[in-house]
A protein has these predicted regions:
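Conserved S-adenosyl-L-methionine
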Residues: 194-302, 307-316, 322-328, 336-337, ...
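A conserved structural/catalytic subdomain of Rossmann-like adenosyl-cofactor enzymes
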Residues: 5, 287, 294-533
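Hydrophobic helix-cap positions at the C-terminus of alpha-helices
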Residues: 21, 215, 345-346
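Residue-level signal for short amphipathic helical patches enriched in basic/charged
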Residues: 28, 171, 219, 245, ...
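Hydrophobic alpha-helical segments and their boundary regions
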Residues: 6-7, 25, 170, 185, ...
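Non-catalytic, mostly N-terminal accessory regions of nucleic-acid modification and defense proteins
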Residues: 1-212, 275-284, 386-389, 411-419, ...
Length: 533
């Protein structure tokens, strides 16, 4: 069996497998099909190799592993014990004839039927709560796959053949998880504006996660929460910056069911233990979640939809998430509603929250101004970081990362203007590791940095009427060098001499003109007289 040897070749091979679907639907639709089938192959391959090793008949060949599995599964003497071990260790079972390897064999024989794959999906979903409804967004009988059942069958079979040669089980854990992340990022690029609901660009995720973990990289059992988790990309960055990644406990909430299922798959592919993931499919701005311990977290990371609509029902004034701040976020701009939800779930001691929002939250008035003032009076806002424009897939507007903490001993706010920290990309601006490092170093120092960072006292903020617009605090104006007056006079004289020379040349040419009639000649002479002054 052909296998990919490096993460980059795996990434490319996975992306190439999308070619079959790319001509039939847009990326926002075909991502569910491709990612779902990759996930099914991962579960199938992992199971086959697990059985072969458990029965002490280890092999690198999926076909041989399937043969081992089939023999023990169909043997009445070993069937019950094998199923028991698989349920205990894997939490799922795929029948031999429904494994990805068996289905691909039928594809090659020309006997594959879509119902076989659909049954495999159903069996996984019914095997454990962890997998419930996981494949519900994958409609194998959609007209998008083909106008007829035969065409639909052919499309799915072609994708399966592309995926069959990939060694996904051999790349299990972070490499496969990162490959999945790569695909999600590629889909985000292809999807354009639709991508914002499920993906946070890695440089921004990296910045926010490192800030959340700063000084706590060695902490065991670090709890992290994203109330608008999308595909889980932002949450899963924790694995990269915790020195005890297997002990990190993840809490996430997502409204969109398709995206929620994507996050569930992403967690499993990254090898997050079942007992360390708590994901919820619901509206963050409706009933509160989580409501059972733990309800407060070491880190809160959020990239909510910007200026979204929400109910802003007056009943929320009695909700402990919002009631301390006297006002509700406007119905047409839920930004502060998301922020206050996340802040409510932050631990009192040493909790750190990072949220990405549009700049309007820094200076808009009315209800938002009241909420902002209350947060500042409480000392909740620790740092404001201005990001470059056009770094997100779903918007070109500049955004800000706001860092919040509870129980601070002062109320100053550190401002970082990182709006120029980017490289120009083909369609978007790109923040590099060097840009992120510059921001992090400033954040750690909280020192004055000319044209980049400023530590504003609470008194200074009050003087600015609680307006946090970054240019009020960080002056990035570049003075132009003043040219000496003698140089300016010299240039004026040179210009005047050039004008005189050109005027003389023009007059010489005009003097050679003659009118074709006495009237025209008189008119021309009058013009020359006026021109000479």
């Amino acid at each position: 069996m052909e296998t990919t040897q490096t993460s980059q070749s795996l990434y490319q091979a996975l992306w190439n497998s999308a070619d079959v679907l790319r001509s039939k639907m847009d990326a926002n639709d075909y991502k569910s099909y491709l990612l779902g089938m990759i996930f099914y192959k991962y579960l199938s391959d992992k199971m086959l190799f697990f059985v072969a090793e458990t029965m002490e008949e280890g092999t690198d060949s999926l076909e041989d592993a399937l043969e081992v599995y089939r023999n023990y599964y169909e043997d009445a003497d070993t069937h019950e014990d094998l199923v028991s071990v698989m349920n205990d260790e894997l939490n799922y079972i795929i029948k031999p004839d429904l494994t990805f390897t068996a289905l691909v064999a039928r594809v090659n024989e020309g006997t594959f039927q879509l119902e076989d794959l659909a049954q495999g999906f159903r069996d996984i979903e019914q095997s454990d709560d962890l997998y419930e409804n996981l494949f519900e967004d994958i409609d194998l009988y959609s007209k998008k796959l083909g106008a007829t059942p035969q065409k639909q069958n052919q499309t799915v079979a072609a994708v399966m053949k592309e995926l069959a040669v990939l060694d996904v089980a051999g790349h299990a854990g972070d490499m496969l998880g990162d490959a999945y992340e790569y695909l999600i990022g590629q889909f985000a690029t292809d999807s354009g504006k639709k991508a914002g609901e499920f993906y946070t660009p890695q440089p921004v995720a990296k910045l926010m996660t490192q800030i959340a973990f700063l000084g706590r990289e060695d902490q065991e059992g670090f709890t992290i929460y994203d109330a608008t988790m999308g595909s889980g990309s932002l949450l899963l960055n924790a694995k990269k910056y915790s020195h005890k990644p297997q002990t990190v406990v993840y809490f996430g909430q997502e409204l969109n069911t398709s995206t929620y299922n994507l996050a569930r798959m992403n967690m499993i592919l990254h090898g997050v233990p079942v007992e360390n993931q708590f994901l919820h499919n619901a509206d963050t701005l409706d009933e509160d979640w989580p409501t059972q311990e733990p309800t407060n977290f070491d880190g809160v990371l959020m990239n909510p939809p910007y200026s979204a609509q929400w109910s802003a029902s007056s009943g929320f004034l009695n909700d402990p998430r919002f009631s301390p701040f006297g006002k509700l976020a406007p119905q047409s701009k839920a930004d502060f509603a998301f922020l206050l939800h996340g802040y409510y779930h932050l631990k009192q001691d040493n909790g750190v929250m990072a949220i990405v929002l549009p700049h309007g939250v820094l200076f808009r008035g009315n209800a938002e101004g009241t909420i902002r003032k209350a947060l500042l009076e409480e000392g909740a806002i620790d740092t404001v970081i201005g990001l470059p424009a056009n770094i997100f897939f779903n918007t070109s507007i500049p955004t800000t990362v706001i860092i919040l903490k509870k129980n601070r001993t002062n109320r100053d706010v550190y401002f970082i203007d990182a709006s120029k920290e980017f490289d120009k990309g083909k369609n978007q601006n790109i923040m590099t590791d060097a840009h992120i490092e510059k921001i992090l170093e400033a954040y750690k120092s909280r020192e004055e940095i000319d044209k980049f960072a400023h530590l504003a006292s609470y008194e200074e903020i009050v003087e600015n009427d609680y307006n946090l617009n970054i240019p009020r605090y960080v002056d990035t104006f570049e003075e132009e060098e003043v040219e000496p007056l003698t140089d300016i006079v010299s240039k004026i004289n040179e210009t005047n001499e050039a004008i005189e020379s050109q005027t003389a040349s023009l007059l010489e040419m005009l003097n050679q003109l003659h009118g074709t009639t006495p009237e025209a000649d008189a008119e021309l002479k009058e013009f020359l007289k006026n021109f000479k002054g």
